[in-house]
Amino acid sequence: MNNLSFSELCCLFCCPPCPGKIASKLAFLPPDPTYTLMCDESGSRWTLHLSERADWQYSSREKDAIECFMTRTSKGNRIACMFVRCSPNAKYTLLFSHGNAVDLGQMSSFYIGLGSRINCNIFSYDYSGYGASSGKPSEKNLYADIDAAWVALRTRYGIRPENVIIYGQSIGTVPSVDLAARYESAAVILHSPLTSGMRVAFPDTKKTYCFDAFPNIDKISKITSPVLIIHGTEDEVIDFSHGLALFERCQRPVEPLWVEGAGHNDVELYGQYLERLKRFVSQELVNL
């Protein structure tokens, strides 16, 4: 305890193990579902129905390229999964874990746009308690959810680990880092990542306590795949320093993308975002 800073002591003794700041910044915020999944009589085919709030930006032909289904996690929840076929000759599939305030319906248009531009298919899923997924969101469920998605991606579609890019955005970097620390893949992309919950709420925190949540900082060094980190320099939710700290701990970091002036929710609106992803997928991975 002698090495604790004053602010850390305050955290420990004045704010018990689940500080309000962590909840306010990192709480799960599932929106009202923006889609439904309807199963046919055979029980094997699911149809995606999007609400107006999903803000679908493409035609029905593009929507036909989206396959949805349900799978069960080790915690007993049924989670919704989405496979977006963006390119017939795609070498890689992104296993995409989205942020904390959206669901698959809201992300579907983005997935089509992203995948078609970087020549990748995209597989995503909703966390427990999000969209059509059952259960409640929690850290333990995050890990069980991505494990179920990983198994479904490999068994249902026969996609090998060397053709999977694990992509996490914001809270989605938590299950992504956990999975990538246990399984090798083609690469890992961390978009606006956090080091840990306590470090977001209390920036002066220097170590990981037993009650800390989402300890990416302690897991990232176990990732043996190439890691690309993307972070906005003006991120108002997860400070830019988190991306830097994770980059410094990577075994196999590639050139990061620090988006000058970008915040937490607008990195993808900057031109260099797509440019960096294209270069990473089409050029750098070939030589790694």
From Swiss-Prot:
Claim: Lipoprotein is one of the keywords in the record: yes
Positions of the catalytic residues: 170, 235, 264
Annotated compartments: Cell membrane; Recycling endosome membrane; Cell projection, Dendritic spine; Postsynaptic density membrane
UniProt KW keywords: Cell membrane, Cell projection, Endosome, Hydrolase, Lipoprotein, Membrane, Palmitate, Postsynaptic cell membrane, Synapse
GO terms under biological process: negative regulation of protein localization to microtubule; positive regulation of protein localization to endosome; regulation of dendritic spine maintenance; regulation of postsynapse organization; regulation of protein localization to synapse
Uppermost EC category: hydrolase
Catalytic activity: S-hexadecanoyl-L-cysteinyl-[protein] + H2O = L-cysteinyl-[protein] + hexadecanoate + H(+)
Membrane topology, record value: Lipid-anchor
EC number: 3.1.2.22
Post-translational modification: Palmitoylated on cysteine residues located in a cysteine cluster at the N-terminus which promotes membrane localization.
InterPro entries tied to this protein: AB_hydrolase_fold, Hydrolase_4
GO function term, MF aspect, one: palmitoyl-(protein) hydrolase activity
Pfam families associated with the record: Hydrolase_4 (PF12146)
Gene Ontology cellular component terms for the protein in this record: dendritic spine; endosome membrane; plasma membrane; postsynaptic density membrane; recycling endosome membrane
Chief location of this protein within or outside the cell: membrane
Function field: Hydrolyzes fatty acids from S-acylated cysteine residues in proteins. Has depalmitoylating activity towards NRAS.
Record family assignment: Belongs to the AB hydrolase superfamily. ABHD17 family.
Protein name: Alpha/beta hydrolase domain-containing protein 17B
Native source species: Gallus gallus (Chicken)
Gene: ABHD17B
